[in-house]
């Protein structure tokens, strides 16, 4: 976000991809950053007409907002062969359609003790209710919190280091 201010002062054009996306949670630093970049950008590239309308209603001139769509479909399409070729299911001994994939690492879920315990208790309850493996792509923040609290996850919860793009998307697809 600070680089945008420096670029603006140096008269470097700023193009903001994902412009107008909002979660409306002012506690998240990303929300503040989005608003600053939206206002500062010379060109705001929105994923949807909804995001564009939001920016225009907030005062961003229409001539600085463009709906370009999400690049995610293109990224997935361009990587589909590598995603399908991933052998992550075999490496982890998982069966297609017979596991739950979990990623939980946001500050508000992990760093607030009550939220963390509520989340981990819910994970354990899911493991018990569905009686299937839960693959937890455990980010450093989460791992540190688990170790610090000594929280015991259900034996069906498999903690794994963060996964790469192809492996993670393969797991999501299966």
Q: Predicted segment positions?
A:
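Active-site and donor-binding regions of nucleotide-sugar-utilizing enzymes
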Residues: 1-61
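Short beta-strands and strand-loop turn motifs
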Residues: 14-20, 69, 102-106, 137
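Hydrophobic/aromatic beta-strand patches that form the interior of the parallel beta-sheet core
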Residues: 15, 45, 66, 135, ...
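Residues at the C-termini of beta-strands that transition into short coil/loop
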Residues: 18, 48, 69, 161-163
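A nucleotide-sugar donor-handling region in carbohydrate enzymes
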Residues: 37-115
């Amino acid at each position: 976000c600070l680089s945008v201010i420096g670029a603006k002062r140096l008269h470097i054009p700023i193009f903001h991809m994902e412009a107008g996306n909002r979660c409306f949670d002012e506690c998240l630093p990303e929300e503040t950053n989005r608003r600053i970049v939206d206002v500062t950008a010379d060109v705001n590239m929105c994923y949807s007409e909804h995001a564009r309308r939001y920016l225009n209603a907030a005062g961003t001139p229409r001539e600085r907002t463009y709906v370009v769509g999400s690049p995610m479909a293109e990224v997935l399409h361009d990587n589909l062969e590598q995603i399908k070729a991933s052998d992550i299911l075999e490496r982890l001994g998982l069966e297609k359609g017979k596991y739950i994939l979990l990623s939980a690492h946001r500050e508000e879920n992990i760093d607030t003790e009550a939220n963390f315990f509520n989340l981990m208790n819910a994970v354990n309850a899911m493991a018990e209710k569905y009686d299937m493996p839960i693959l937890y792509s455990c980010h450093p923040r989460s791992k540190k919190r688990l170790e610090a609290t000594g929280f015991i996850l259900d034996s069906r919860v498999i903690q794994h280091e963060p996964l790469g793009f192809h492996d993670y998307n393969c797991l999501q697809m299966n």
